[in-house]
Amino acid sequence: MEYKLKAFCISALLILLQVNEIFAESGYELWLRYHLIEDVALKRYYQIKNSSIVFTARTQKQLVAKTELYNGLKGLLGFTIQETHDVKDNCLLVGNVESSPLITSLLCAKELDSLGDEGYIIRSLQIEQKKVTVVVAQKDQGLLYAIFHYLKLIQTHQSLDGVSVKEVPQIKYRVLNHWDNLDGTIERGYAGYSLWDWERLPFYRSQRCVDYARANASIGINGTVLNNVNANAKSLRTEWLIKAAGLADSFRPYGIRVFLTARFSAPQEIGNLDTSDPMNPKVKQWWRNKVTEIYEYIPDFGGFLIKANSEGQPGPQDYGRTHAEGANMIAEALQPYGGILFWRAFVYKNERYVDRVVTGYNEFKPLDGQFKENVFLQTKNGPIDFQPREPFHPLFGKMPNTALSLEFQITQENLGHAGHLVYLAPLFEETLQSDVYGDGKGNTVSKILQNYHETCGMSAIAGVSNVGTDLNWTGYLFGQANWHAFGRLAWNPDLTSEKVSEEWVRMTFSNREDVIDSIKRMMLISREAAVNYMID
């Protein structure tokens, strides 16, 4: 069996090396490779289907979307699309409800309302016997997502005849967690140093940070936590908030909101208080003042991520308070601004005779219903600590009155770092499709997350990032596939690993069937292979 696996991997890599266009590429473009289509007939087909465009861009995000579309089409088709104000045959109509009354009139109001802020429609229609393709959203953010999807259709050689796509994200907050330290190092990072050039911020605006935001937007990620969960209190000092605001300015055009981790003892460490007791009025006021200051610098600040009373981190239990009391105190400060709090449910102490597997469950289950409505309990996919295989965390299905956020680890802490090809979409899918049997059969983790979204509009999923300063972003090329897979499954938790992997291979390498089949197969068996050899 081992010999057959090695032989297959070698043959797959040989096929990969035959794909001429990957030579001399660094991997920097990720899955957004808008290279000229080589098939002459196919290229001509897409040129005809994009003969002209009606797209009036007025806002910053609309201009970003328009630039993305024009650059993508020019790269893929080798020409600049003709802009017009009149509808012509094979015209592309692009806009949102506010910017294009014409497009709005083509679709029913109920369907447009169902898109929300981030959903979109791509559809073939006829206007006065003229064939057109409509790309429409309610809001600018949805329009940007629609543009990326439209380019993906061409990039992956899909037919535009009779196209009908409607996409609405199933999870509201789709957030990367960066375990980046303020000195530029990354805990569990295997792809270089932090992308955030703190020493030169806020005045230096890195193109790489813009490209990072663009890549995230292309897969639907809409938030990023800048710093390590093992937090440094000085990240909340004014000079560091100004630096974070510089990053937020770079991310904002792509719809990426900035979050920060906060150290629970910050009132003592940087606020000159003698306590961080969440019931102390001075402590409460300190957090209110700090949050107000943050929103002055970052008006669309997302909120905080906090690790408390775990692995030596300070927390409310230091003062005899519960996790709910500690979380609610900070959540109250965030609430007037629409901010949210991710409170990690990964808690354990280095004590003998304590079953680490059940610690989180025992601490948080009794607190169900005691957390404020803008608090998420950020819960790892398994009860131990990002192992190659774990059952789903027992809190899922057992806290019906508390919003839980699912936390995956994209960086490969226990799966070979950046030295082993391990495709994580099967791991993500395994967790999401696990049946918790909380209310009978069919109550999967995915459904639990989506139910939060449907009932209270609060749903979230987080991924510990594998991104760094390496030119290929993730230390090795297939690490990009894990970043991509997280974004796609965060948008739609019911996608399959097979579908997501094929999409990534087509966008990153080639649309040749032999290349797709070989690389996809290698990816899909890699996680199971890693589990087997790491257990053995």
Label every PLM stretch briefly.
Residues 233, 268-277, 307-318, 346-355:
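Active-site-proximal beta-alpha loop/turn segments in soluble metabolic enzymes
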Residues 58-68, 72, 109-288, 292-305, ...:
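Feature activates predominantly on carbohydrate-active enzymes
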